[in-house]
């Protein structure tokens, strides 16, 4: 038979120690033709296939480095003849022939680890490249390679072969037991970590796990720990330390894995790991240091099975003075259940379904904390824990007050970069997050999520454990929880008032500063709160987005809708602790409580008068400005308040909606009806603290108090005379104007006051209302009656001279008609 094509396979130590190559045994057994056998070792070469170690009966020959070119002679007729025989043979025979040695590139490919590759010198590496490329070309010329392997592509590109180690999971491994039997060992300077991993993989290879993901990582060198709480079986033969050479030291560690896809019986394997398979060389003590690095990841995929899967990656790292953790490591993302590769460099080599990217080993520990719920970083000040060190750093700025991120436009500072980035969108107007339902855009993604839940889905996944109230986001829940705890962590430095929310404090501080940063573009009115501006803009647009489902009434603000809804339900959740009175709106309760406390926080800057409500202050200020924006369309009369206009319009319409239940009398306004009812009840709730006199109305008490104080706030602009009552000023001004609005229907006589008209009417009717009991004399006016009583009491009348014309009331006593003064007939 002519010379056969020789395809070379080599063991790692063949290149390391002796510079020789071993050949693949031919199907017939014995050394291949045309090969040079090394003296003293006719059958000790133990080549391994990619899938399993070579059988004992396969023999190889070792050739010298100088004669390796003789191995590359080709004889295509030989292999083609074998192919024809196998195709013509029966099925059983064909399979047997295949098992006996039809060569593939996987059978002859040798993969070095990084540690092994580093021990090769430049000559050995060049020899390795040449042999592997020649082997591939030989097989390709025979048609035994359908496509170019990745390993050859890498070699042609000049990359080191150990980079392809994980892609070729079933690489060649050492058979330590076989080497012991043949008394043949690799050179002592071979990396002991390489030997250990080789033995470990060989021993556990028949017991690979069934789970595809777990098996893929296992074949790359990963080690798994069992699920806690699941049934396990143990049954793996253990390598005794006696099987190793005397110089070897060992330690034991349980290495287990399981079938993640099956809750049933879980196979558990245990092996003895050899830590120091070979004695260390002193010359290499500083260069090679074996270290074990573990990364534990908790698997949330199997929590519904009452179990916990942890992935532990034990790996021997070679650490040099200038290089550490150079080899990548495998891991699994717990959120996505996906395997990824870890590089020690800063580049991120994996993106999982949860949006996280992983780089170096410490980052994996950080991601482990997120997935498993563990919090690894604790603040020394408040003991709060975080899953990321960066979160702890940002949190610590709360205690230190540090705000390193400053806006160049407004000077506002922030403690974290994300808040600073969001703030800058306020200046740029950029709103990258748009609602797909209504098209509304937001600065923050969280704002879009809250909007989506609140307006479109109605989802409220966050429940309060105290009252059961649900919220669409955790921020709203946390703020609500402060109602139950009473916590008010935000305090104003000026007035020391505390608030539950930081936004409330910010708005409150504008009261002290007078800042109103939000301005309406239509009317230029400014507001201290953005929500107030939004509500105000609905006045111009007429928008009322909040609609009552019961009656269909629409409102500009959500809080107004909530208050209105309580009209239908009758709910009054806000109760006064002093008198027990309930209210449907919290602001009404706050206003009511000022009655008990006497607090009047709203003060007029002109007259220093204080009010309990801001609306009352606004109404009062119109008395100083003279502003009367509300005008009656019927008569043109103007009013300072809209309620006064409504009451006035009832004069034209004749509407009297308020009716007395006692006498049936109707009134145009509620206050008049309330005052009228006190005539029936005799109630006089307003008492003067000076003299004890009581009054039915509060306005009557206020006017009465001026008798004690002498206050006369109403002054005539024509003559300068002052009055204690506004009505007295109005009557007096008619003297200057000559206006007499009250006319007698009998004689057409006119009067300045309605009281004068009533007195005049008694002249026509002859009515005498006031009777004197002693003399049985009657009088039409109280003034006449009082003057007459002074005559009987012996007191001289107070005024004998003509009355002053300044008060027209005094003139009537001199001109009143008296029938007794007429001469008798």
From Swiss-Prot:
Q: Which Gene3D superfamilies match?
A: 6.10.140.140, Classic Zinc Finger
Pfam families from the xrefs?
Answer: KRAB (PF01352), zf-C2H2 (PF00096), zf-C2H2_6 (PF13912)
Listed SMART domains: KRAB, ZnF_C2H2
**PROSITE patterns in alphabetical order:** KRAB, ZINC_FINGER_C2H2_1, ZINC_FINGER_C2H2_2
What ranges does the record give for the region Disordered, renumbered to this chain?
26-65
Q: Which GO cellular component term is one of those annotated?
A: nucleus
| Comp. bias intervals (Polar residues) | 51-65
UniProt zinc finger (C2H2-type) residues: 377-399, 405-427, 433-456, 462-484, 490-512, 518-540, 546-568, 574-596, 602-624, 630-652, 658-680, 686-708, 714-736, 742-764, 770-792
Origin: domain of life:
Eukaryota
Print the keywords alphabetically. Answer: DNA-binding, Metal-binding, Nucleus, Repeat, Transcription, Transcription regulation, Zinc, Zinc-finger
Compositional bias annotation for Low complexity: 33-42
Concerning InterPro entries, the annotation shows: KRAB, KRAB_dom_sf, Znf_C2H2_sf, Znf_C2H2_type
Biological process according to GO: regulation of DNA-templated transcription
Where in or outside the cell? Nucleus
Give expression by tissue.
Expressed predominantly in ovary.
Q: Which PANTHER family match?
A: ZINC FINGER PROTEIN, ZINC FINGER PROTEIN 606
- What is known about what this protein does? May be involved in transcriptional regulation. May have a role in embryonic development.
Q: State the similarity comment.
A: Belongs to the krueppel C2H2-type zinc-finger protein family.
Protein's recorded name = Zinc finger protein 28
From which source organism is this entry?
Mus musculus
Q: Which gene encodes it?
A: Zfp28
